């Protein structure tokens, strides 16, 4: 019998990863805005993602819709436990989206919209990190009902992961701008990105050390045999790709810094999945316990398998059409 729950969790996991990468670098551009005061530089930065930024968020919608369709218990429980940070994240996304469009229309109030774009980008990343940290720490449930407090999500660890996601997005943004720009803006990114990579490596290390120490079940999953043998390449590869990303910046490579950062994101995400598997509401509810009826999963899976190739095609097409570098004075992006 086909395990529809496993198929759905793979779809959702891949969708979330694509969202983190695609929306990560365009959120990173807003996070990097304070490093640049000139309007021309900021225009170029925004133009690198103007044709694709709203499409990038499609993957967040796909992940949320997938949870609702295939794992309704997760949707209701996680939403109840993380209601406030999710709402604040959505508000920040709205501010950022409005600022993105209004900044080019209202020259008189451009400074205000710049600040809204910066604030919306930083807060979106921060609250996504808060949600991640709270999820890793676990969600208190009894018979499928959330039984924790309204502020259980707010802990030093979740704040730290919030900062970590902001740094992650800024690093992706640096890599994207190195690839998509040239001249002075690109040179500045070569200076900023190594600092971001080092900060990101430190954050990855702290989270990797804290998580197994605070959660014995996660430590057992990583450090018992044969898992230890299978998973030991993950931290080694993190070291390797961190070094290669730093070297690529020093050698002024254009695509490599972004690709090595992408590899670090995939490795960190892999570690996250390994730590929690098979629990979808950590630390007690597995994907099979939280699953919708098979008939519901099958019906929605058919729709997803029809829709996902279309999303992939138009996403790939938009990136292909706007594949060239963006320079000062380029028009047609708005």
What feature does the model see in each segment?
Residues 2-5, 32-33, 37-50, 287-289, ...:
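Extramembrane terminal tails and long inter-domain/linker segments of multi-pass membrane proteins
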Residues 258-266:
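Central hydrophobic cores of alpha-helical transmembrane segments
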Residues 8-19, 79-91, 118-123, 152-166, ...:
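Alpha-helical transmembrane segments
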Residues 281-300:
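Short, membrane-exposed interhelical loops at transmembrane-helix boundaries
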Residues 102-253:
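Long, contiguous internal "core" modules enriched in hydrophobic/ aromatic residues
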